[in-house]
C-alpha cells in the first residue's frame, strides 16, 4: 500500500511467464514491464494480451520494447495494454570540445563521443499517434 512498484523486463526471460505473473502479484508489484516474451512488443502483442488477461485487475501489463509512433497504436489494439513504455531515444554528439581519438575508455568499437538522449519529437509523435485510441 506504499509506493507503486514495476517489475522490469526480467519476466521476458522466464521459463513460465504465467507462473511468474502469479509470483510477481504475490510480491505486491503493481505493474509488469514486458515485450510479451519477444524481441519487441509488436512481435509479442498476442502474448501481451494473454499476460494482461492472466494479471487481471491485480497488475497492469506495460507493453515495452521497440515501441514507436508507427507501431504504438497497433500494439495497444492487439495487446489490450493501456500503458506503453518507449525509450524514444536518439544518438547525439557529446559536448566534449577536445577529443583524443587515440585513447579509448572501454571497448574500441564504442563511440566515446556520443550518448543516447530522449528525442522529444519522437515522444510527441507517439503521444499524437495514440491520442485517439479508445480506452
Walk through the language-model features, giving the residues of each.
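C-terminal helical cap(s) of enzyme catalytic domains, especially alpha/beta-barrels
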Residues: 45-54, 74-79, 93-135
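Glycine-centered loop/turn motif at secondary-structure junctions
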Residues: 1-2, 28, 134
